[in-house]
From Swiss-Prot:
This is Flap endonuclease 1. Residues 349-357 are annotated as: Interaction with PCNA. Interacts with PCNA1 and PCNA2. Three molecules of FEN1 bind to one PCNA trimer with each molecule binding to one PCNA monomer. PCNA stimulates the nuclease activity without altering cleavage specificity. It comes from the Eukaryota. Its EC number is 3.1.-.-. CDD domains: H3TH_FEN1-Euk, PIN_FEN1. Mg(2+) 2 binds at D181, D183, D246. Belongs to the XPG/RAD2 endonuclease family. FEN1 subfamily. It comes from Plasmodium falciparum (isolate 3D7).
Amino acid sequence: MGIKGLTKFIADAAPNAIKEIKIESLMGRIIAIDASMSLYQFIIAIRDSEQYGNLTNESGETTSHISGLMSRSIRLMENGLKPIYVFDGAPPELKGSELEKRGEKRQKAEELLKKAKEEGNLEEIKKQSGRTVRVTRKQNEEAKKLLTLMGIPIIEAPCEAESQCAFLTKYNLAHATATEDADALVFGTKILIRNLNANATSNQNKNKNNSKRGYILTEINLEQVLKGLNLTMDEFIDFCILCGCDYCDTIKGIGSKTAYNLIKEYNCIEKIIENIDQNKYQVPSNFRFQEARKSFINPNVLPKEDIKIDWNEPQIEELKHFLIKDYNFNELRVTNYINRLLKARKVTTQRRLDNFFTACTKKSTKLIVEETKKEQTLPARKGKKRPTAGDKNKQKAVKRKIEQANANGHHKMKEENKSVDNEKNEDGIKSVDNEKNEDGIKSVDDEKNLDDEKNLDDEKNKDDEKNKDDEKNKDDEKNKDDEKNKDDEKKSLDNFSSNLFDSDKESESGNIIKNEKQNMDDEKINDNLPSLFGDHSRIRHTENKDNISDINNNNNNNNSSSNNNNISNNHFNSVSSNSTFNSSTKLKSEDTLKSNSPLKEDSPNSYNNIKNNNHTININSQINNHKEPISNNNLNNINNSTEIKKKNTLFLLPFCPKDVTNVKKKKYTQRC
């Protein structure tokens, strides 16, 4: 019968614990099936449609349970399930009163069935015939023989089949329990499957348009039930006893809802009985709830060591003889069953992916060894641990002991220890020794840890200082190298500029520098003339200037055409024409100076020696370039213009050879 209203209450209070699954989801799973419940279903379901009687052989023996058990087992195996059938043993003593009640109900149903047959009421016949069904021992033995010939394992429980199935799931020998009795959850089955038998043999859940639709089954998870109801296993057992079970009577007026509220408030049946209203809720005089609790917690089941589950090959010849000769089954039907059985056994040999990928909860010895090695090789963490109050007290105690040992000496300590050991008992000696060893070990470990930490800190500080010194040296070397590179670059630039504008080199810039030097020398000579010749020199110098201006005017008039031609020609031709003109002017100026000079030609301070300076040549060259009468202001302007040209040439003039005519024409004559 199970627990009254349990599945309905679970569906309402803990809906996550119940779910519908397909039979394909159980592929490769071992399912423990309540055999007596299955046989009861077969005898009720498989009947003659005319008289609603059982299928029988020639001798009148019932064969409904054999045909139903064989067809269902083959269908489960075809879907990949591995069934294990568990048969009931002797009923427990607590169930005696329940069995008496069932016997009385069966007698009443037989009386009603006789009346329905006399009246010809088919609906009443069908209803009452199901209540009169009873599975006999002979039928159980016939079912056991059939399953052994098919190679399917069976287990004979010493007591209840539901309790044995539940413990198979606890032993991890089965995945779930297939039964209609909800008391399998109270025995502790992990997963309960309902409607497996009905759905596996009927077509009621198939869709006409889609015949390949899988069967829908109901699965109840005990762990989710306890979470949803927020109960412990002991509280859940007391709750089921209050709802109504096969092992004791129930308290009148208490259903599943009130039982749940009372358990949540008082946690156990004893407190409920003490605090319950006896007038409202009548407790039975023989309320054996404690014995029922024990039977649920410690049922009479086979231990794990005594359980043997063997999957054997089917005995085909013996199976044929058993079905055809003993129970008059059709031979074609039997051969069809056997062929299906052989194919189904190949399907059951397939394994699930869960079997290949199982979770390992224990660490292997290799992992443990590797972890210990890593912990030993790991460097100590930076910084010191903050000592706690206990550590400080231990350190103080260690220091005191050391001071006392140094003061008294090792010999006195030994004598005191001997006297103390003689006075104490053996138990006291052991306790003291253990405490001393622990304190000594701890103190030594603390000292070692402190020394290790200090050494590590010193080594780290040294390494940091070395790294800082190395970084400073590297920075100094880099700065020195940078300064050297800068000095080398400056020197190279100075050399480059000196090469470009060196007076000794044959370049236009060199000639400009020479001319500037000559101008500076001429200015010095002009400044020194008054000191050498006095006022007379000034007169002569002015006369010389006048003569030079007259010569310049004449030459400008006579040679204007030639100079214009020279300007239009190349730069090199202009240089040659100017040189000839300078030579002529030089001769004329020399004559005038000779005639007017009162000094001797041989005197070292004579004007004839000074006239050989490049002063006149420089002046004449400037006259040719400017073509204007030269005065002191004009000379200053010329000097300023030369300085401006000098600055411009520093930035504009490239380096090129003096005699450009001798250089061959190429695409790249010379790069600047």
